[in-house]
């Protein structure tokens, strides 16, 4: 009985993690495409409502345009690790490689995003 319960917990956990990974994959791909196109509206729509209120569309515009002019296109995102609900990626731009930290809300919207030097 214990093993059946343990197996059920493992299968359920694996299913939840797979759904979580799929949400992150979808969001990172959309962010990369919209960042490179400098589609501010599309990037803004990826943000959770709380982030939209906090950053405003003008703030997102400054963030995207500033990063794009300084770093170039975002060529590749490579998963590094997940810790405390935040996924870390190596973000390879034309001019620099940075670490991108990303946290999604339960709806798959960006709750936190930041770039920093490795």
Where in this protein do the model-derived segments appear?
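Surface-exposed, charged secondary-structure patches
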Residues: 64-107
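Short solvent-exposed beta->alpha transition segments
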Residues: 25-26, 41-81
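Short helix-adjacent coil turns
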Residues: 31, 35-42
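A short, surface-exposed interaction/processing loop segment used at functional sites
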Residues: 109-118
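Positively charged n-region of N-terminal signal peptides that target proteins for export
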Residues: 1-4
């Amino acid at each position: 009985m214990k093993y059946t319960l343990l197996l059920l917990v493992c299968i359920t956990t694996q299913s939840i993690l797979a759904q979580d990974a799929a949400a992150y994959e979808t969001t990172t791909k959309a962010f990369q495409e919209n960042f490179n196109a400098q589609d501010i509206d599309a990037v803004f729509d990826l943000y959770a409502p709380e982030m939209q209120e906090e950053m405003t569309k003008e703030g997102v515009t400054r963030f995207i345009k500033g990063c794009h002019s300084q770093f170039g296109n975002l060529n590749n995102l490579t998963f590094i690790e997940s810790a405390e609900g935040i996924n870390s990626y190596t973000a390879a731009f034309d001019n620099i490689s940075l670490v991108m930290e990303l946290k999604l809300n339960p709806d798959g919207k960006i709750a936190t995003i930041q770039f920093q030097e490795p």
